[in-house]
């Protein structure tokens, strides 16, 4: 399985993202979900998710939080980080999220949009914080799969409205059945597909190529 970046960065990445959320929430007073959104819209999440050394190892957790706040709110916090020995639930949430993003190579914005919100992650703390992180991965996958099944992608919605099966769409468009399934489940990003692939799927469905793209 292809991961998001080299595993040698992983321990630092997990600790730093955990410290980032801990500092932002418990020292600076930000709402966990709100700060997760700031992390994404700031662009820091994109760089972090690609394993940019500046972000996964070069900045501490509080420094990451400061960068996020600076980019989104045009200010920097002056609150010093606390020196608590015990790890908070927010630390665990960020730590686990970093591992999940690395393991699946999904973008942070896709993870959140697919239902794995910070609220959902924090709700798992009581039962999973002492478990192996692989258990978190399993539960997180279930949450995302259920969310995607409930909501559906644009491709899935348009295909069903047309009355076409996945197999038929594969035959008509030339796209593999597996890729169509992955696009519908949002386990592959249709926005990143080759333009010719999207055009062929759109023609088979009788829609515009842009109708198949997902909002960010």
Predicted regions: what is each one?
Residues 10-67:
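N-terminal interaction modules that seed assembly of large macromolecular complexes
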Residues 25, 159, 170, 202:
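The alpha-helix within a helix-turn-helix
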Residues 65-73, 194-211:
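DNA major-groove recognition helix of helix-turn-helix/homeodomain DNA-binding modules
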Residues 141-162:
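A short, Lys/Arg-rich alpha-helix, primarily the initiator
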Residues 155, 169-170, 180-184, 212:
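Conserved hydrophobic/aromatic packing and binding residues within compact polymer-binding modules
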Residues 165, 176-179, 194, 208:
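Short coil turns linking two alpha-helices in DNA-binding domains
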Residues 175-191:
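Recognition helix of helix-turn-helix/homeodomain-like DNA-binding domains
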């Amino acid at each position: 399985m292809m991961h998001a970046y080299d595993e040698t960065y992983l321990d630092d990445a997990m600790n730093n993202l955990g410290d980032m959320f801990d500092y932002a929430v418990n020292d600076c007073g930000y709402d966990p979900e709100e700060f997760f959104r700031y992390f994404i819209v700031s662009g820091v999440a994109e760089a972090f998710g690609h394993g940019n050394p500046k972000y996964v190892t070069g900045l501490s957790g509080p420094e990451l939080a400061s960068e996020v706040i600076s980019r989104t709110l045009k200010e920097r916090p002056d609150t010093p980080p606390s020196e608590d020995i015990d790890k908070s639930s927010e630390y665990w949430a960020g730590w686990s999220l970093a591992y999940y993003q690395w393991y699946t190579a999904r973008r942070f914005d896709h993870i959140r949009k697919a239902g794995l919100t910070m609220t959902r992650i924090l709700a798992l703390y009581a039962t999973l914080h002492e478990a192996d992180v692989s258990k978190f991965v399993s539960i997180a996958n279930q949450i995302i799969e259920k969310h995607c099944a409930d909501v559906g992608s644009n491709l899935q919605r348009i295909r069903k409205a047309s009355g076409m099966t996945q197999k038929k769409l594969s035959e008509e468009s030339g796209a593999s059945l597996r890729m169509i399934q992955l696009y519908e489940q949002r386990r592959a990003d249709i926005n990143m597909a080759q333009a010719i692939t999207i055009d062929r799927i759109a023609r088979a469905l009788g829609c515009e190529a842009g109708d198949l793209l997902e909002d960010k």
